[in-house]
């Protein structure tokens, strides 16, 4: 029996969170390489800690990239520009350890080189995409508000409106659902790193008035909504000084905030031959078009692959009982409409471009930027036609 009245919570972290610093560095390196050589194979991992950034991985490319320069530019743009923060773009050490892609993997993802002649998947695995009609961007409401809160904290910091904020921040939003529909925001948590000399009450009032109330619609707040602002009382030590950051540790923040499922693979630092990334983008594209076509209010798509094999080993569609047709019928329509072989995904979504640094903070999904081709809803008419609607 489905729950009829419940709270669902999602979180987001800002571009200055140490794990997100690592994601952005990995994707900035990927972009710098793709800008010169679009056939590159990139798997770039980053670790950031007090006074140091380390990049490592497997990269096969004809591009010539000055990796330390890219790393420092990302750290500067985020706002770590003072050694008092324990992490500073000008003075941090940058260490690199880069190898080439394994030839055994390469032959499986290079057209004509492996047992199968088509470009195969870069690894086995399962990937999910999700969409629902709770927001205009067809994303769950909790993660949508959570991302907007962390983005707003970045905006007021960089614009100079709240000069005492520093780059590392987090948000969390709990939404009440009744009969599977979001009706109100129950709890908002925001935490932001700050200068040591700001009074707590000044910080709290500023974050409520200039962040929370600027993001969450007034009709979703009521007298029972709870605000928790920097609930430890002090957040001066933050960023890579406060916690070691690693690429790929915020996979739920990157996707749907815990709604839907996740196959476990991270995105950042991976070129689109890695289906962890490209097939997850494709699954979102499929699910979003199904919901936009009003074939269902909610849609989850699973795609699974074998390494070196182009055709997915399985495609599953679940509409959670909200479909105008049975899920297996929508799955049949999806298989007819979308080509989910890796090379076709790359072509359909035009993924061999330096577009990835923008994805690495504030969510890979639900932001309708021109570069985010997987957010298009250009298959609606075709899907409705196939469904006979």
UniProtKB/Swiss-Prot annotation:
Cofactors named for this entry: Mg(2+); K(+)
Residues binding Mg(2+), per UniProt: 19
First-level EC class: transferase
List of residues binding K(+): 45
Biological process according to GO: one-carbon metabolic process; S-adenosylmethionine biosynthetic process
Keyword Metal-binding: yes
GO MF term (any one): magnesium ion binding
Catalytically driven reaction(s): L-methionine + ATP + H2O = S-adenosyl-L-methionine + phosphate + diphosphate
Matches recorded under NCBIfam families: metK (TIGR01034)
Function of the molecule: Catalyzes the formation of S-adenosylmethionine (AdoMet) from methionine and ATP. The overall synthetic reaction is composed of two sequential steps, AdoMet formation and the subsequent tripolyphosphate hydrolysis which occurs prior to release of AdoMet from the enzyme.
UniProt-recorded name of the protein: S-adenosylmethionine synthase
């Amino acid at each position: 029996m489905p729950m009829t009245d419940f709270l669902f919570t999602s979180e987001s972290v800002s571009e200055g969170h140490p794990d997100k610093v690592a994601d952005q560095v990995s994707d900035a390196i990927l972009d710098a390489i793709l800008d010169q050589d679009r056939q590159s194979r990139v798997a770039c991992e980053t670790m950031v800690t007090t006074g140091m950034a380390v990049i490592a991985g497997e990269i096969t490319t004809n591009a010539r990239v000055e990796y330390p320069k890219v790393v420092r530019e990302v750290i500067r743009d985020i706002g770590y520009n003072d050694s008092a923060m324990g992490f500073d773009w000008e003075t941090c050490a940058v260490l690199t350890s880069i190898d080439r892609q394994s030839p055994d993997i390469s032959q499986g993802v290079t057209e004509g080189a492996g047992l199968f002649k088509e470009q195969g998947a870069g690894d086995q695995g399962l990937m999910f995409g999700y969409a629902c009609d709770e927001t205009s961007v067809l994303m769950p409401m909790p993660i949508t508000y959570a991302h907007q809160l962390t983005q707003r904290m970045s905006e007021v910091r960089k614009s100079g409106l709240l000069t005492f904020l520093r780059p590392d921040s987090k948000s969390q939003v709990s939404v009440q659902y009744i009969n599977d529909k979001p009706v109100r925001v129950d709890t908002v948590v925001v935490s932001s790193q700050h200068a040591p000399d700001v009074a707590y009450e000044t910080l709290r009032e500023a974050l409520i008035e200039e962040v929370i109330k600027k993001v969450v619609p007034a009709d979703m707040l009521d007298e029972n909504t709870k605000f928790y602002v920097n609930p430890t009382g002090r957040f001066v030590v933050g960023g890579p000084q406060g916690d070691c950051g690693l690429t790929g540790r915020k996979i739920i923040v990157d996707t749907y905030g815990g709604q839907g499922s996740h196959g476990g693979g991270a995105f950042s630092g991976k070129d689109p031959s890695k289906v962890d990334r490209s097939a997850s983008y494709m699954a979102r594209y499929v699910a979003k078009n199904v919901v936009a076509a009003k074939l269902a209010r909610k849609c989850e798509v699973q795609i699974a692959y074998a390494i070196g094999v182009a055709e997915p080993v399985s495609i599953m569609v679940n509409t959670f009982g909200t479909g105008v047709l049975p899920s297996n019928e929508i799955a049949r329509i999806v298989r007819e409409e979308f080509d989910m072989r890796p090379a076709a995904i790359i072509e359909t979504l035009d993924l061999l471009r330096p577009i990835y640094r923008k994805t690495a903070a504030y969510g890979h999904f639900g932001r309708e930027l021109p570069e985010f081709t997987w957010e298009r809803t250009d298959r609606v008419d075709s899907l409705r036609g196939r469904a006979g609607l």
